[in-house]
């Protein structure tokens, strides 16, 4: 009797199915990581913008107005919308400063929010 050498068609198809599933899983994972990297970059840039605005307002020694103020800025080659507003605290000499960063003025959710406090001199 001759002994067969090699693999049967069924064995080849099973191996092919296993490798294709592994490839699809790897592709999905890579796509998810690419999406997350983009979101992380956007959040990082937004946090830098909020920090810069906070420092700018503190250096100018401005008492934050209670009305919302906003500005369209270009940063890292992209346009962003910054808004900031003073919020009263229980102490009259202390006011909270809320800064929010959005991609567009009409966006409902901020990409990044920052709260700091300003003492009235």
UniProtKB/Swiss-Prot annotation:
One Gene Ontology term, aspect cellular component: plasma membrane
Listed Gene3D superfamilies: GSPII I/J protein-like (3.30.1300.30)
Major localisation: membrane
The UniProt record lists the keyword DNA-binding: no
Propeptide: 1-6
InterPro entries linked to this entry: N_methyl_site (IPR012902), Pilin-like (IPR045584), T2SS_GspI_C (IPR003413), T2SS_protein-GspI (IPR010052)
Residue positions where N-methylmethionine is found in the record: 7
Sorted UniProt keywords: Cell inner membrane, Cell membrane, Membrane, Methylation, Transmembrane, Transmembrane helix
Membrane-crossing residue ranges in chain numbering: 7-27
BP term (GO), one: protein secretion by the type II secretion system
Pfam family, one: T2SSI
Compartment list: Cell inner membrane
SUPFAM superfamilies (alphabetical): Pili subunits
Quaternary state and interactors: Type II secretion is composed of four main components: the outer membrane complex, the inner membrane complex, the cytoplasmic secretion ATPase and the periplasm-spanning pseudopilus. Interacts with core component PulG. Interacts with pseudopilins PulJ and PulK.
Stated family: Belongs to the GSP I family.
Database matches in PANTHER family: TYPE II SECRETION SYSTEM PROTEIN I-RELATED (PTHR38779:SF2)
NCBIfam families: gspI, IV_pilin_GFxxxE
Purpose of the protein: Component of the type II secretion system required for the energy-dependent secretion of extracellular factors such as proteases and toxins from the periplasm. Part of the pseudopilus tip complex that is critical for the recognition and binding of secretion substrates.
The protein, known as: Type II secretion system protein I
């Amino acid at each position: 009797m001759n002994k067969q050498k090699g693999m049967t068609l069924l064995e080849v198809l099973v191996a092919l199915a296993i490798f294709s599933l592994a490839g699809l899983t790897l592709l999905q994972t890579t796509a998810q990581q690419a999406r997350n990297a983009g979101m992380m970059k956007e959040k990082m840039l937004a946090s830098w913008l909020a920090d810069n605005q906070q420092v700018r307002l503190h250096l100018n020694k401005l008492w934050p107005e209670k009305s919302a103020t906003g500005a369209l800025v270009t940063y890292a080659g992209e346009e962003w919308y910054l808004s900031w507003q003073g919020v009263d605290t229980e102490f009259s000499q202390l006011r909270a400063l809320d800064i929010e960063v959005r991609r567009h003025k009409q966006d409902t959710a901020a990409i990044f929010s920052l709260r700091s406090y300003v003492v009235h001199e």
